[in-house]
């Protein structure tokens, strides 16, 4: 009876048991991805995140192609397969950990396994989906609302005391509408910068290559396609300036 109970527990918590076993490999893979992401930057911070940066997976694939050109190696093939499996599981797990019923555990996993550069006093609420967390910075006192999507593949920098309301979407990559297969385009990707004390209302969407200035307010439901001035209030689709916020 005890054995059956133990088997049931293993089945219920199987995802988390696999995660615990793979914690170290997951951190190593994310560390490699972060190094690749920052490879062409002048420094090792995200303060200049508006620069166009290569995606980590593309760099890894390019490296593998160069190695393959030099000849076949079973060890190299196995290494590549293992890396791809762990990398894929990492992308899967970060989508499932968002539902773990513990704010403390979620933030610990984001910071130390997926290498999200988040301040201890920042808050990431239930259901937030983070992509490429190793290229995401969240400053002191900032709040990420429930069910937000932070697509940090090209880098996202969120300053201090920023408020992202529920279901805010930040997209650093998009598709080319003129391409017959809607493939990605270098002109449709770029980092997003959100200055300190900015407030993004519920269901705001911010597209690639956008800088939202300090203290700016983006009204609920807006779609931001261009830079927003500091302390400006913008609204609409596409977002346009409708006023200014007090600087006091």
What does each of the following model-derived ranges do?
Residues 1-114, 197, 237-248:
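Terminal amphipathic alpha-helical/low-complexity segments used for targeting or macromolecular assembly
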Residues 100, 106-107, 128-138, 143-211, ...:
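Flexible, glycine/small-residue-enriched loop-and-beta-strand segment within the central core
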Residues 200, 218-220, 235:
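Short glycine-rich loop/turn motifs that provide flexible caps or phosphate-binding loops at active sites
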Residues 208, 217-219, 223:
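A generic "structured core" feature
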Residues 229-230, 235-238:
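Acidic, glycine-centered active-site loop in nucleotide-sugar glycosyltransferases
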């Amino acid at each position: 009876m005890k054995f059956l109970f133990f088997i049931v527990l293993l089945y219920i918590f199987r995802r988390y048991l696999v995660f615990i076993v793979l914690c170290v490999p997951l951190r190593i893979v994310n560390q490699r991805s972060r190094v690749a992401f920052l490879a062409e930057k002048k420094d090792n911070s995200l303060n200049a995140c508006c620069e166009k940066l290569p995606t980590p997976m593309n760099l890894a694939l390019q490296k593998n192609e160069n190695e393959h050109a030099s000849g076949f190696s079973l060890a190299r093939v196995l290494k590549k397969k293992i890396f791809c499996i762990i990398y894929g599981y990492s992308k899967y797990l970060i989508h499932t950990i968002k539902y773990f019923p513990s704010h403390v555990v979620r933030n610990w996993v984001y910071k130390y396994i997926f290498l999200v550069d988040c301040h201890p006093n920042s808050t990431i609420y239930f259901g937030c989906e983070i992509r490429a967390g190793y290229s995401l910075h969240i400053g002191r006192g900032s709040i990420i609302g429930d069910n937000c999507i932070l697509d940090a593949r090209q880098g996202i920098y969120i300053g201090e005391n920023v408020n992202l309301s529920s279901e805010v979407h930040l997209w650093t990559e998009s598709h080319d509408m003129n391409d017959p297969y809607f493939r990605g385009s270098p002109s449709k990707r770029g980092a997003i910068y959100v200055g300190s004390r900015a407030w993004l209302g519920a269901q705001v969407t911010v597209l690639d290559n956008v800088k939202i200035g300090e203290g700016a307010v983006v009204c609920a439901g807006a779609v931001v396609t261009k830079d927003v001035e500091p302390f400006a209030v913008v609204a609409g689709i596409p977002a346009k300036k409708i006023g200014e916020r007090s600087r006091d």
